[in-house]
Amino acid sequence: MKIVKESLAGTFESSDLLVKVAPADGKLTVVINSEVIKQFGHQIKQVVNDTLKELGVQEGTIIVDDKGALDCVIRARVQSAVLRATDGQQIEWEKL
């Protein structure tokens, strides 16, 4: 999927996260800010990267501000932000 505009998904509430997505040419940059980065940073990065790979995102800037969200919430917020930022092409729901 190609990211063509900026988008947001989520909140700053406890047990949630805010995902910001923006277009970027040629590279994929993922920035993760979390209150629990020392304990769960590797797992958060893994879930975000796996979700982006499943969606076919190869370039863009992804900023994740985590407040202790579970994996399923991370996945859902990343999916929502990316889908809002795409060019409206047909979504392949079976990949999600």
UniProtKB/Swiss-Prot annotation:
<protein>
    <recommendedName>
        <fullName>Citrate lyase acyl carrier protein</fullName>
    </recommendedName>
</protein>
<dbReference type="GO" id="GO:0005737">
    <property type="term" value="C:cytoplasm"/>
</dbReference>
<dbReference type="InterPro" id="IPR023439">
    <property type="entry name" value="Mal_deCO2ase/Cit_lyase_ACP"/>
</dbReference>
<keyword id="KW-0963">Cytoplasm</keyword>
<comment type="subunit">
    <text>Oligomer with a subunit composition of (alpha,beta,gamma)6.</text>
</comment>
<comment type="function">
    <text>Covalent carrier of the coenzyme of citrate lyase.</text>
</comment>
<dbReference type="Pfam" id="PF06857">
    <property type="entry name" value="ACP"/>
</dbReference>
<dbReference type="InterPro" id="IPR006495">
    <property type="entry name" value="CitD"/>
</dbReference>
<comment type="similarity">
    <text>Belongs to the CitD family.</text>
</comment>
<feature type="modified residue" description="O-(phosphoribosyl dephospho-coenzyme A)serine">
    <location>
        <position position="14"/>
    </location>
</feature>
<keyword id="KW-0597">Phosphoprotein</keyword>
